[in-house]
Every structure is written in C-alpha cells, then in structure tokens.
C-alpha cells in the first residue's frame, strides 16, 4: 500500500495572499490540490485532480504577486523558487521588463512505495530514462528510487530545480541517505553531472531533468 506524505501544506498556504489561503483552507480539499494559479488581472484558481476551480472573485494585483515573491525569495535562472525544507515549487511568469505577472504554485508531495512498477529495472543496475507528460509523477518516482538505492549504494542526486530534494541547503528526508548536488545554472547542468562523478565517487547518479544535448552526452 502506498503511503502519501504531503509536505506541510500550510507552508505553501502561508506564502499566499491571506484571502487566497483562507479560500483554500475553507475548501478543505488540500489532499487533492495540485497547483494554485495566480495571474495578474485574473481571478486566482486552484487545480485539483478533477479540475480547476475559482478561489475568489477578486482579480490578482501587482501587490498580491509582490507579497508572494517577497515571502519566497529570489527566482533561479529558470524562473523557479521554492520553500525551504519542502518540495513545493513556485514558478514565475515575467514580462519583458522582468517583472512577475504570473505564478504557478505547485504542491510537492513525497510518496513512498511508488517504485514497485519499475522495481525490477531499478535493481537491474542498468541506466533508466523516465519519459512522460508534466505532473504524472516522474520526479516522485525518481525521489523514491534515490532513497531506496541509497540504502545500499552511494547515490548522488543532480537536482535540476531542487524538486527531488526540496529547496534549501538541507535535502528533504524523502531522499534518504542520497546526497544532493544543486544546479546553479540549468544550462551548465552537464558540468555538475561530470563533477559528481569526478569528485564524489557515486555508484548511482539520479538526474531530475535532461533536456540538452550536452546533458545527454554527460549521462553516457
């Protein structure tokens, strides 16, 4: 049986404007919550497993977005930010002047027992590539695979956007004994991959996202 552990949803609610946080709490559906969408000039919405609903009838203002940004800190080069020691992710949409005009606040969850479907592949010792559309659980499976493999092997996680190990300098407990290397510039992730091999003697490397030719070459 799967055991779902949700990173304290209150940590995410606390960075949102009060009226939006209150609407989420009142809806009492946080177990099903996937994302909160905040776009300038539009009403805020919540995306659940069965669809999208409006949270309030008030349109999002610059002040609303500024409030959230101030509470989460700076965005990385890929316009993503997080909440320390959680798996939640906030992605920004910016205008041509670099000002935030939209936010996608994704709920991060650690789910134990998700690797059963590929357990034989994980234990084979061969390289594995997971493909699929966004939001179907690729990172969740990678996180759990890293935890399981780290019980017996030296595992390094190259964490493209801090989604496997969470935001902050201390990795989330869901990765177990696996060590985590953060990627300061996504365009240079291949260098972090090579550094992991050369400096830290891993038996297994887990990479969250591979989307560039240099990264594919480094993975070989």
Q: Where do the model's predicted regions map?
A:
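Conserved P-loop NTPase nucleotide-binding/switch module
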Residues: 201-202, 206-220
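N-terminal accessory targeting/assembly segments
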Residues: 1-86
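Well-ordered alpha-helical segments embedded in enzymatic catalytic cores
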Residues: 89, 117, 141, 188-195, ...
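Residue-level signature of catalytic and energy-coupling elements of molecular machines
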Residues: 36, 90, 159
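P-loop NTPase nucleotide-binding module
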Residues: 107, 118-163
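Short, ordered loop/turn segments at secondary-structure junctions
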Residues: 41, 133-135, 160-163, 185-188, ...
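P-loop NTPase switch/communication element
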Residues: 149-198
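P-loop NTP-binding catalytic core
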Residues: 56, 68-128, 168
